[in-house]
């Protein structure tokens, strides 16, 4: 049976099936559970989670319903539970009873809904079959894909109790360290914590207490840890152990132009993490406004924005995967900061925005920074960044991930939610009535104008609203002629409809009424 995809999605959204899903996959189940079901299960679990709908196939914006009766779907449900608990089928069962349900779409046509949560990093990789190197999948904008062995090995390394930066580097020596860097670290520690007991130690025991030098229990030999070399090492030594290591700061005068200032490993300095941080920070923070704050009778030149920016900088170093590709890249624009680091996030995006749960990839490097007062250990770092940007009435920080190679990008825009020039542009396109729209709709249009488009996921991070509420607003903005959708389903993006302008009638009144009607729970 052929149905418009949007119609089926609307039915399922009204039933509350899709409300929390970031991604969606349809599967036909006419002949039983398809093999691709398990590929999607693995892919969702190793990514940001998602929803699988069995009993539907999708093509060219249409859904083709299998027409399965309830008795057939219940049989597939029993088969599903038997298979997911079989270790030879899949490595781990992440689901509970509430994650799997039968839904009637229309008449006697049923589908099986499977909501897959993102797996904790401790359970990754989630793979099908008995060979993780061949049975691990992940998700990107094109769909499910089989991971390369290198991706699988990095997931496995992140799942181990010993963090990658705590491992002893075989054949490393003290000669691999840049001692002037170590002296600088001591001096800063002395300035912030003059009575710290580590300061009385000689270099070797000092490095041991920091976790930079330790014994390999398997061989009985001492050496530098990955953290010790990355933090205090010589550039050549770092690159011998970490061939893809790269750190790069760029200051760019305006969007699209070439950098006007840059710090990168050019051979004139030892490009370890400590030197990179302390060379970049003054340039990164130079243009920030300095508040007048008093602390114990003394003026403080740094406020919440400085602290948040430093937290973001430290986090990009603490959470980076130094075996990954691309290195750490920091870009400063006149109106924004970009922090990009190799690796994938060890907590779901939703958890990052909530705060309160930090899972650093490099705990020893985090300790080294936290001794100097940088890098939160209590999971409040993201909240500090969000709070500071909110206090300045700037657009909410946006974090995104890409893979192949894995990269995490934190975008900190110093723009108000509704810039004057954006409102003027919207007024030029749609007429003066656009200013009378309710706040969230105006934010959606302004974001689409500034960023070239919006998605449900982007707006969830911006508006702090449920995906179902945002879906209603986006649908209404499309129906009234303000937005044009591209693609269909949960991955739809929306762009300003610059071709036809405002229809007759009051959009903001229509939207308010329609939203209130759909949200009425009385």
Show the residue positions of the predicted features.
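Short amphipathic alpha-helical interface segments
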Residues: 434-454, 522
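Amphipathic alpha-helical dimerization/coiled-coil segments
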Residues: 506-522
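Conserved N-terminal catalytic/coupling substructures associated with nucleotide/phosphate chemistry
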Residues: 1-304, 310, 314-426, 432, ...
């Amino acid at each position: 049976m052929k149905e418009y995809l949007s119609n089926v999605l609307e039915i399922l959204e009204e039933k509350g099936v899709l409300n929390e899903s970031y991604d969606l996959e349809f599967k036909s189940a006419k002949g039983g559970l398809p093999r691709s079901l398990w590929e999607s299960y693995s892919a969702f679990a190793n990514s940001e989670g998602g929803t699988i709908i069995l009993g539907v196939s999708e093509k060219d914006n249409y859904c083709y319903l299998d027409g399965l009766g309830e008795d057939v779907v219940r049989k597939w449900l029993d088969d599903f539970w038997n298979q997911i608990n079989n270790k030879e089928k899949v490595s781990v069962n992440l689901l509970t009873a509430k994650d799997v349900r039968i839904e009637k779409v229309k008449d006697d046509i049923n589908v099986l809904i499977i909501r897959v949560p993102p797996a904790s990093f401790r359970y990754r990789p989630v793979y099908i079959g008995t060979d993780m190197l061949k049975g691990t999948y992940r998700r990107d904008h094109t769909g499910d894909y089989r991971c390369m062995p290198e991706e699988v090995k990095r997931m496995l390394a992140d799942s181990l109790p010993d963090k990658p930066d705590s491992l002893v580097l075989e054949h490393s020596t003290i000669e691999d360290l840049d001692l002037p860097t170590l002296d600088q670290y001591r001096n800063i520690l002395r300035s912030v914590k003059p009575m710290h007991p580590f300061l009385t130690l000689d270099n070797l025991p000092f490095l041991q207490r920091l976790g930079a030098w330790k014994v390999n229990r398997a061989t009985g030999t001492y050496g530098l840890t990955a953290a010790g070399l990355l933090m205090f090492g010589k550039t050549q030594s770092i690159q011998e152990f970490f061939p893809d290591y790269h750190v790069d700061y760029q200051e760019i005068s305006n969007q699209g132009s070439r950098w006007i200032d840059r710090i990168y490993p050019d051979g004139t300095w030892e490009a370890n993490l400590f030197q990179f941080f302390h060379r970049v920070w003054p340039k990164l923070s130079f243009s920030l406004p300095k508040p007048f704050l008093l602390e114990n009778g003394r003026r403080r030149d740094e406020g919440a924005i400085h602290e948040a920016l430093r937290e973001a900088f430290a986090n990009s170093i603490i959470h980076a995967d130094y075996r990954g590709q691309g290195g750490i890249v920091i870009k400063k624009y006149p109106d924004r900061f970009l922090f990009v680091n190799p690796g994938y996030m060890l907590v779901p995006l939703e958890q990052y925005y909530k705060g309160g749960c930090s899972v650093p990839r490099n705990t020893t490097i985090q300790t080294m920074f936290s001794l100097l007062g940088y890098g939160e250990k209590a999971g409040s770092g993201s909240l500090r960044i969000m709070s500071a940007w909110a206090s300045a009435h700037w657009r909410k920080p946006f974090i995104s991930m890409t893979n192949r190679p894995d990269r995490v990008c934190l975008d900190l825009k110093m723009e108000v939610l509704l810039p004057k020039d954006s409102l003027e542009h919207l007024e030029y396109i749609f007429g003066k009535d656009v200013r009378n729209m309710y706040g969230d709709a105006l934010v959606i249009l302004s974001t689409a104008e500034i960023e070239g488009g919006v998605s449900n996921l982007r707006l969830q991070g911006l508006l702090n609203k449920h995906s179902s509420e945002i879906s209603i607003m986006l649908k209404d903005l499309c129906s009234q002629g303000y937005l044009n959708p591209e693609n269909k389903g949960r991955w739809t993006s929306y762009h300003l409809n610059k071709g036809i302008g405002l229809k007759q009638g009051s959009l903001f009144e229509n939207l308010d009424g329609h939203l209130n009607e759909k949200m009425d729970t009385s």
